[in-house]
Amino acid sequence: MLEMPPPMAIVQSAPGDRCGGQQRCHMAPGPQLLAQATGGGASASLPEGGPSTPTSAQAAAAPPAGRDITTFYDRDGLKARWYFQAGLNLVAERHLFWDFASVYSPGADFNSDENWLEGYVKPGIGFDKTMARGHVFYGKLSAVASRTWGTDAFDATNGHATTLEEGYLGLRSAANATNLDLSLGPRELELGDGMLIANGGTSGFERGALKFGPRKAWRHAAIGRMFDRRATLTGYFIEPNELPSNNGHNQLAGTDFRYQTDAKDYIGLTYIKVLRSDSPYIRAARDGLGAPTIIPGGRDGLNAWNLYLSATRTQGALRNWLVTGDLAYETNRRINMEAWGGRAQIGYTFAQAAWKPSLTYTYKRFSGDNPRTAKLERFDPLYYEGSPDAWATGSKSSMVFINTNLKAHELALAMQVTPKDALTFRYAYIAADKLGSPIQFGQATRPVSTPSGFNQIAGVTKHHLSDDVFVEYNHIYNQHLFLTAGISASFPGAGIKAAFPGKAPTWTGAFVNVVVNY
């Protein structure tokens, strides 16, 4: 997703770099208590409709930056600058959620065809002061004002809010073989590849700008880093910036170790401890028969480990190949929970071909709760990065299915049509990991005929959920102005069709947005 210029989020990139980001989505409409059973959800922009960063080729083609108009003071080691980001996004949706609302909540007056406009502005100011021995005292203050004009996909009308985004002070050493970086206050933090810790802020609903999702910073953050040329050790305490209407009062702490080679290959391990949470979990009914059970405060006490790695080659026999891998394991003895999730990805860039096409295959799997065991196996995706090339599973479907009880095969073909124009085609085959187990939060609990009579079930009776296609176009006008447009469709699979009386329609949509970024 598009981010502001440095000082940026603390993203675990090249050690020694100077420091400068989940969707709370539910199958609308549904029982509010069940909708909250995600345990907090993910709060980024949705995987389609949000602004995209330019590709490296596009960025290289942009005109030189020239005079830095954002720096307004630079004297005696003190440098101060302003930041500004803004965007407008026009969205159209047809047959939202495959028209499920007309079947399971016919009295809710939910419109499955919507058009809306959304926008945001994100101004900020930052400084850094170079002191003796190379130490740098730095800080940043920014805010987000967001709004939706009309009714969005989750039936929220004219939502708007102005909130603090970042507001931190920090101290960094830079002249030693091993350096320290300490900061306190709201700011962005992404660990690993963004599988569990990436987006600390929630947009949409009463705050507006559902698709853009401009909020990324954690509401409270204390972050310390020790790094040398290749290795980085991070310790953190964070609280997400949650919606007032769905505040799980989450607090997390942990560590991250990352080792990176000169070739930018890396491997790392993140540990997460949920110190406090009111966010509930959901458990499948025994043998999948009956309504799911809510576990109040289920996330409280969760332990999670995330191993991640990435390798790419620019020369030799394996040049132009990319391989990444992520594996997460979660446990919570208090509620007898044990879950896992992971991703394997391989890609190749045809560097000598016209348009330099790159083809990437991704396999993802996130455990679902097995209704035949007493243990809770439902994976908690926490605060993942929800952009198309990160952890969104599908395009349309990711507005319904968060990364739990899912498995998916994904293909992406990206082409650099001109130095300023990029085109990406994405396809996703999405299936349920466990049958008779909640796919999302428990909506569509329904009676079905069984040999023993009618029983209630949640989830699906067939694995295949949907096939998603998404075509995205990105144009860079200059280093500050970007345009993104896309069209997408989700074709219901056997699992969705079996839960829908009659013929389930194809869910389609389109968007176009413009973003200004300084």
Identify the meaning behind each predicted range:
Residues G254-A311, S437-E472, T484:
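Outer membrane beta-barrel transmembrane domains
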Residues C19, R24-C25, P29-G185, A222-M226, ...:
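Beta-barrel outer-membrane channel/assembly domains of diderm bacteria
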Residues E118-E242, N250-G254, R258-D262, Y266, ...:
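Outer membrane beta-barrel
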Residues S277-G368:
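Long, internal scaffold/assembly segments composed of regular secondary structure
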Residues R94-V103, G150-A156, G194-G201, E239-G254, ...:
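Outer-membrane beta-barrel translocator domains and adjoining extracellular loop/strand segments
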Residues F205-A209, T232-N241, L269-K273, W321-T331, ...:
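Transmembrane beta-strand segments that form the barrel wall of outer-membrane beta-barrel proteins
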